[in-house]
Amino acid sequence: MRIYHSNNFRSGRKIIFENEPCLIESSEFVKPGKGQSFVRVKLRKLLTKQLIEKTFKSTDSLEIADIIEYTLSYLYNDGRFWYFINNNTFEELSVDEKIIGVHKKWLLEQDTCIVTLWNNQPISITPNNFVNLKVIHVQATLKGDTINTSSTKLATLSTGAIVRVPLFIQVGSLIKVDTRSGEYVSRIK
């Protein structure tokens, strides 16, 4: 069992806290004028995405989480599982739809994404920051809508995602979308 002592807690390190893998988002070493020093830490639980703040004594230690991140290509889904392949080893990995969650609207076949494993079990996926998707339906607009330059309309994309787009986007357009915010970025020509 490998451990990190509290004075080695750094941003980006992954540890086990309360039997759950956590990511250290920030840590601050505090040495008060009187008393024992301590470390104030913000942890993000990787299974529930919950953010917690915790204070550890300088003598505390936590186990290092067995977290591995792979860059895999999305192949297909059968409704319950989503299948990915490692392009280096050609090993396939199936991920339950519950783990895919809201990211399924950003996945296209052959796109790469990061799959995070804990004890060789998938716990999360992270799609590319930007994806290019085809518009298959747009909301009807009124003739006077073009007066306001900040006007937008809803567009349905090939994966089923719905995003706000400028009025000039039409059915068949290829657009770039930021998967972190779900917002339109630009039109692809």
From Swiss-Prot:
InterPro entries: Elong-fact-P_C, NA-bd_OB-fold, Rib_uL2_dom2, Transl_elong_fac_P/YeiP, Transl_elong_KOW-like, Transl_elong_P/YeiP_cen, Transl_elong_P/YeiP_CS, Transl_elongation_fac_P. May be beta-lysylated on the epsilon-amino group of Lys-34 by the combined action of EpmA and EpmB, and then hydroxylated on the C5 position of the same residue by EpmC (if this protein is present). Lysylation is critical for the stimulatory effect of EF-P on peptide-bond formation. The lysylation moiety may extend toward the peptidyltransferase center and stabilize the terminal 3-CCA end of the tRNA. Hydroxylation of the C5 position on Lys-34 may allow additional potential stabilizing hydrogen-bond interactions with the P-tRNA. GO terms for cellular component: cytoplasm. It is found in: Cytoplasm. One of its GO terms (biological process) is peptide biosynthetic process. GO terms for molecular function: translation elongation factor activity. Keywords: Cytoplasm, Elongation factor, Hydroxylation, Protein biosynthesis. Pathway: Protein biosynthesis; polypeptide chain elongation. The modification N6-(3,6-diaminohexanoyl)-5-hydroxylysine is found at K34. SUPFAM superfamilies: Nucleic acid-binding proteins, Translation proteins SH3-like domain. Gene3D superfamilies: 2.30.30.30, Nucleic acid-binding proteins. Belongs to the elongation factor P family. Involved in peptide bond synthesis. Alleviates ribosome stalling that occurs when 3 or more consecutive Pro residues or the sequence PPG is present in a protein, possibly by augmenting the peptidyl transferase activity of the ribosome. Modification of Lys-34 is required for alleviation. This is Elongation factor P. The lineage of its organism: Bacteria, Pseudomonadati, Pseudomonadota, Gammaproteobacteria, Enterobacterales.
